[in-house]
């Protein structure tokens, strides 16, 4: 029933507000966890089919996403922690489930020139800048609001990135919306405006394992990427500027292919990963969300399909997971036990004029949509 509010007391929360509408529920919680003295909010979206997403105000992190297999058995398919404090531990985890900004992916040597001025950013992935810097959007507190709409139940994350934050020019107003629908869609909407020209490239850094987090590696997952070309990288994982054909290479995922089938081939680009950590140039015809990728776990039948308005997709095969982190299952996250599919503009675009521009101008808005659809068969 639209607009029905329920107040509940819980052991892990100071307050819970739940809204129920059209078979969907959205629950916002103030947890007992704090970051730098500030409480962490948590939101849960659930659809009529039982799919359930949980996210927190720190980094907009998706901490849990439970989807069914072909037999109707649910599993949490995203890597993460039970204890929220682990998300802001020192050293920090590798961007599990977080909103990435102001610029997702790498900027060469932490520098770019805009309007005749050179801006210097943190080289937090030496010698380059990665995912917005030392304290990017993944390490910031966001304000969460909730709403019901014709599309579904939504959690809306907002924050103001001040002028000069992590070296970027301009005050950026940012809104990221997670919407769960009864069609088993997770819709990711990104919106931003600025008062000065600035690079913007927002994405989401969930690590997927469709067999269930903690279940082992993802090498048997079958991946399809709708791309005829990719952007080769140098030894520091910065694009060379070339748009190379995937034909005859381990980067050809135009047909469903097991991730492990070619990942260790004697290929110069794979050695630089080591493994997959590259941007694919998506085949696009229009301006709306178009098919980008499909990921399937043959054993469980769980499948996700991605459509996006973005021109690129970064496929990262979890090469640097090393077993040092223990996940929700109580099992260590070893190498390649999760993978990322990050919809995006291309890496290092501010320094590569032949790539689609990522410069947002005052008076314009940054708007991007990615739709992740879950199924099992």
Give the role of each language-model region.
Residues 11-21:
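Bacterial N-terminal signal peptides
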Residues 1-12:
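Bacterial N-terminal signal peptides that target proteins for export
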Residues 24-377:
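An exposed, glycine/acidic-rich loop-and-rim segment of catalytic or binding clefts
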